[in-house]
């Protein structure tokens, strides 16, 4: 089964409706639309691989962190914040070249045809996603906010 989860990118309205119509003849292709919070866990736990068919990114991918927290292998474009997360935070996956259908297909095939590799990627992603417990993430944010406040107070004292 192939599941297309989520809604249109605001920059490309109608994309999913068009894809659904174009590929309506493909068996076992399901479009979920908006995914409610209670449906997130089953969606990930029942998936062998999570694919990010993005051609551009803006900001860190929460979906990558979610996929990692469920121990899932990922396929993603070799660009922006996704590539940085692989490089700096310990996530692992198969890259594809954005806008290249053959590259995307090859990346998916590489994972789904090799169970050992797929499991290895999922384990690495779980480790990366759980490396920083929420308490530690919260403490890092609070410290950073305190530093910002301290800097602003010091600048205000100096008349800036």
Residue ranges and their predicted role:
Residues 55, 72, 76-86, 98-99:
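Short glycine-rich donor-binding/catalytic loop of glycosyltransferases
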Residues 110, 134-160:
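C-terminal alpha-helical cap of glycosyltransferases
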Residues 16-38:
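Nucleotide-activated donor-binding/catalytic signature segment of Leloir-type glycosyltransferases, i.e.
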Residues 88-101, 110-115, 130:
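Conserved acidic donor-binding segment of nucleotide-sugar-dependent glycosyltransferases
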Residues 110, 117-131, 143, 147:
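A short, well-ordered alpha-helix in the C-terminal region of glycosyltransferases
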Residues 1-17, 33-34:
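Glycosyltransferase donor-sugar binding loop
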Residues 43-59, 72:
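Acidic donor-binding loop of glycosyltransferase active sites
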